[in-house]
């Protein structure tokens, strides 16, 4: 039997009618015992990543510039200076819960700029 190239095979497929292609696919399934739906299922991702609509902002550590971090926490959360200091001293501590991811990123940027270590969960 003569071996044909991939290009020749594709050209042959182009010349076939839809019915002939369907018959060809059925013959391949039967000959090789292949079920194309099993391959399609395997190729589909099992789980998609869930987009969070609310996150939690946590202060992990104040870093070297504790006073600057206290001021930022005070301004962001509207706390008194003493309450902000207590919150920073108690790190790791939750600064805000159930906030929008965009807002959390904004807060994180300000805190990191002041020298804090922050996480968004």
From Swiss-Prot:
* A single GO molecular function term of this UniProt record: structural constituent of ribosome
Q: Does the record bear Transmembrane helix in its keywords?
A: no
Q: Which GO terms describe its cellular component?
A: cytosolic large ribosomal subunit
Which keywords annotate this record?
Ribonucleoprotein, Ribosomal protein
Give GO terms for biological process: translation
Which Pfam families does the annotation name?
Ribosomal_L12 (PF00542), Ribosomal_L12_N (PF16320)
Coiled-coil region = none
Q: Does the keyword field hold Ribonucleoprotein?
A: yes
Subunit details: Homodimer. Part of the ribosomal stalk of the 50S ribosomal subunit. Forms a multimeric L10(L12)X complex, where L10 forms an elongated spine to which 2 to 4 L12 dimers bind in a sequential fashion. Binds GTP-bound translation factors.
Q: Which family does it belong to?
A: Belongs to the bacterial ribosomal protein bL12 family.
List the HAMAP family: Ribosomal_bL12 (MF_00368)
Role, per record: Forms part of the ribosomal stalk which helps the ribosome interact with GTP-bound translation factors. Is thus essential for accurate translation.
PANTHER family assigned to the protein according to its UniProt record, in alphabetical order: 39S RIBOSOMAL PROTEIN L12, LARGE RIBOSOMAL SUBUNIT PROTEIN BL12M
NCBIfam families from the UniProt entry: L12 (TIGR00855)
Q: What is this protein called?
A: Large ribosomal subunit protein bL12
- State the organism of origin: Mesomycoplasma hyopneumoniae (strain J / ATCC 25934 / NCTC 10110)
Question: What is this protein's gene name?
Answer: rplL
């Amino acid at each position: 039997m003569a071996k044909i190239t991939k290009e020749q095979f594709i050209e042959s497929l182009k010349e076939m009618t839809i019915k002939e292609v369907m018959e060809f696919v059925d013959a391949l399934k039967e000959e090789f015992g292949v079920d194309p739906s099993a391959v399609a299922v395997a190729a589909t991702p099992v789980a998609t990543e869930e987009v969070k609509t609310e996150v939690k902002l946590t202060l992990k550590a104040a870093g070297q510039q504790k006073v600057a971090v206290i001021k930022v926490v005070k301004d962001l959360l509207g706390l008194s200076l003493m309450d902000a200091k207590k919150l920073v001293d108690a790190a790791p501590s939750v600064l805000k819960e159930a906030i929008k991811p965009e807002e959390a990123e904004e807060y994180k940027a300000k805190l990191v700029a002041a020298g804090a270590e922050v996480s968004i969960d």
